[in-house]
Amino acid sequence: MKVLALRHSVAQVYADTQIYTHDETKDDYENAFLISNLTTHNILYLNYSVKTLQILNKSGIAAVEIQKMDELFTLIRCNFTYDYIDDIVYLHDYSYYTNNEIRTDQHWVTKTNIEDYLLPGWKLMYVGYNGNDTRGHYNFSFKCQNAATDDDAIIEYIYSNELDFQNFILKKIKERMTTSLPIARLSNRVFRDKLFKTLVSDHSRVVNVGPRNESMFTFLDHPSIKQFSNGPYLVKDTIKLKQERWLGKRLSQFDIGQYKNMLNVLTTLYQYYDMYHEKPIIYMVGSAPSYWIHDVKQYSDLKFETWDPLDTPYSDLHHKELFYASDVTKLKDNSILYVDIRTDRENADWKTWRKIVEEQTANNLNIAYKYLSTGKAKVCCVKMTAMDLELPISAKLLHHPTTEIRSEFYLIMDIWDSKNTKRFIPKGVLYSYINNTITENVFIQQPFKLRTLRNEYVVALYALSNDFNNREDVVKLVNNQKNALITVRINNTFKDEPKVGFKDIYDWTFLPTDFETNESIITSYDGCLGMFGLSISLASKPTGNNHLFILSGTNKYFKLDQFANHMSISRRSHQIRFSESATSYSGYIFRDLSNNNFNLIGTNVENSVSGHVYNALIYYRYNYSFDLKRWIYLHSTNKASIEGGRYYEHAPIELIYACRSAREFAKLQDDLTVLRYSNEIENYINKVYSITYADDPNYFIGIKFKNIPYEYDVKVPHLTFGVLNISDSMVPDVVAILKKFKNELFRMDVTTSYTYMLSDEIYVANVSGVLSTYFKLYNAFYKEQITFGQSRMFIPHITLSFSNKRVVRIGSTRLNIDFIYLRKIKGDTVFDMTE
């Protein structure tokens, strides 16, 4: 949902939009809670409170102040990610298709012939890093830029088996127009940038597990971050290959040679970062014009020095000349060298050209060895061709996508590699590598071992759920890693499947109860965003590709109502109750009936079950930003930090009742996952709360009324307001609590409206209006370790007779309290009080 804050109402009516006017009788937290549970996507918030907007944004719900109609129109028609700290709106708006254009934020694409293969009459637009160049389109009171681009489709095309780009991009545009927006992918780049800047400033050692190409710009400015990936393809790994011949295959209609060069250099750069944790000088020989340097400089202040007879406009220092082996002495330590020398074929015949290529390959390799033979802190990436070669066994092979697969590949070496054992590699083996291997990632660092790191902050986004990881080891890492942000795939199957298929792999599935964490926040993507200064206009949908975000070591853990809080907890319930169910009271009715409470009069205002816990369980697929386990734990230890709101602390027994209702719901829905989740949450409640039951009571609290509107034959009809199992020495403690609650007890609006047979020969009258106070009293006794209440649900009633009687219904009648007392069962009254 998105909340657009206005000072005045607007005349225009918008689809899927609701107006909420700030309620001055409620505080900011209560207003935020009410807004978050509205069911429409767009909320126009009138007479708004800035504090309420802050609360919503911290909860991951985008809430933006609107000053002009243009702002309203722009934000209401598309989704966005909002940086509420720096007041920047990142639109995810593809309406630019109506201008017959596709967009890119990679400058090199604009220097290709891609426009020859676009849809007729279409053009390509460059919009800068995260759409930064579009800011001029929006003259708003907040910074605004459109971060939506088609780079995902362009890159997918490059790695696909499709050659016809026009057909491919047409299909992708149609897909985008007919399926829900993958907003997490769009928003993720904004999130990653913010996340790692924050972590690097707060932690001296940060580890990142499983980065992919979409992060290749994110980490350019963070050389200290240790990366773990799937490891490199080494020269020695070619021993498994059979020999093949030249294949020759076109991968792309438009020229992607610059993209290949960029990937080669960035792969080399991240190898350098992995070894030396600082920024090097980047030397490049050949590969002009290297327009992609402009893209790199949008993210980092890396320095480039280049050699090529052709211009390289974005180089910091360009030498418009050839580079020779003798020039290696000009290169400094703490650097990387990219050697991409290859002359044009022009009119040379094949044999002559092949001889030139092999000579240049040998020359390139000689330059690389000479560069690595002296000095320190050096890594080299060199252009090679398939030919009989001796190569260091530990050198890394690269074959990033290029326009045509021919005979070229690349080799990365560091100083140690260059001096390592060499192995003869036949030309046919190298052709086999080229023909069958595409390097898919610029991150080729070693795989992560699932073990706790003592002094590091571990980030593992979408990296650990794969079933090639041992599931128990993943759980152990989450439980024991002190500082971390780890994601795992949430189990939102209905059959409690332990793993699910995704693309061509399988992922383990998890529930929050799979982890034993006491100082970690377990939330959703949008819940996590709120903790890093971001919010989003479109909440996660239960697509099957959803993840739990687990934050360990965060200073926000105790701020229960500020982050990963109960905002939107009833939203799915409201959507169902007011559109699909038998009655808008269905949830209240079901919760009472499933706990054998058949008095449904006033069930919507006097319910014996925690609605928060019930909704968090049965609708967890729709809203798991609310960290239920943390909410339970902090209340059980009395450590919850509550900033505001009409906050009601549930008695532990109300939580138990909610689990039982959710379990009943799951059985009716044949939802095995909710069934397990409900059982495990109930077990967790029993673990963190020391709940004892007065199933063999020796005292009870009684309430005698001045008027009973029914016939009765018991000596003193009364309401048993709970039973206790206590020693006589604890009586003063019980009395002290009763005295503390005196005013609230006598203020109860107690009513009755019918009689019924509680069981055979037990004739009783119903009592309404006491449950809220009963559970508050329960909590007070629990905190003093006084056993109060039974394991079965408390159903307030007045016993009228121990014989079978005819049921009577009357109008709702108020019962006036005469006095309240504490009495020993089969004994004397030890305390009483009157108003």
Swiss-Prot record:
Disulfide bonds: none annotated. One of its GO terms (biological process) is viral process. Residues 556-692 are annotated as: GTase/RTPase activity. It comes from the Viruses. Residues 171-245, 429-555 are annotated as: N7-methyltransferase activity. InterPro entries: VP3_Rotav (IPR011181). Keywords: GTP-binding, Host-virus interaction, Hydrolase, Inhibition of host innate immune response by virus, Methyltransferase, mRNA capping, mRNA processing, Multifunctional enzyme, Nucleotide-binding, Nucleotidyltransferase, RNA-binding, S-adenosyl-L-methionine, Transferase, Viral immunoevasion, Virion. It is found in: Virion. Its EC number is 3.1.4.-, 2.7.7.50, 2.1.1.56. The active site is at 718 (for 2'-5'-phosphodiesterase activity), 720 (for 2'-5'-phosphodiesterase activity), 797 (for 2'-5'-phosphodiesterase activity), 799 (for 2'-5'-phosphodiesterase activity). It catalyses: a 5'-end diphospho-ribonucleoside in mRNA + GTP + H(+) = a 5'-end (5'-triphosphoguanosine)-ribonucleoside in mRNA + diphosphate; a 5'-end (5'-triphosphoguanosine)-ribonucleoside in mRNA + S-adenosyl-L-methionine = a 5'-end (N(7)-methyl 5'-triphosphoguanosine)-ribonucleoside in mRNA + S-adenosyl-L-homocysteine; 5'-triphosphoadenylyl-(2'->5')-adenylyl-(2'->5')-adenosine + 2 H2O = 2 AMP + ATP + 2 H(+). One of its GO terms (cellular component) is viral nucleocapsid. Residues 246-428 are annotated as: 2'-O-methyltransferase activity. One of its GO terms (molecular function) is hydrolase activity. Multifunctional enzyme involved in mRNA capping. Catalyzes the formation of the 5' cap structure on the viral plus-strand transcripts. Specifically binds to GTP and displays guanylyltransferase and methyltransferase activities. Has affinity for ssRNA but not for dsRNA. Capping activity is non-specific and caps RNAs that initiate with either a G or an A residue. Together with VP1 polymerase, forms a VP1-VP3 complex positioned near the channels situated at each of the five-fold vertices of the core. Counteracts the host innate immune response thanks to its phosphodiesterase that degrades the 5'-triphosphorylated, 2'-5' linked adenylate oligomers produced by the host cell IFN-inducible 2',5'-oligoadenylate synthetase (OAS). The host RNaseL is therefore not activated. Interacts with VP1. Interacts with VP2. Belongs to the rotavirus VP3 family. Contains a bipartite N7-methyltransferase domain, a 2'-O-methyltransferase domain and a GTase/RTPase domain. The C-terminus contains a phosphodiesterase domain that degrades the 5'-triphosphorylated, 2'-5' linked adenylate oligomers produced by the host cell in response to IFN stimulation. This is Protein VP3.
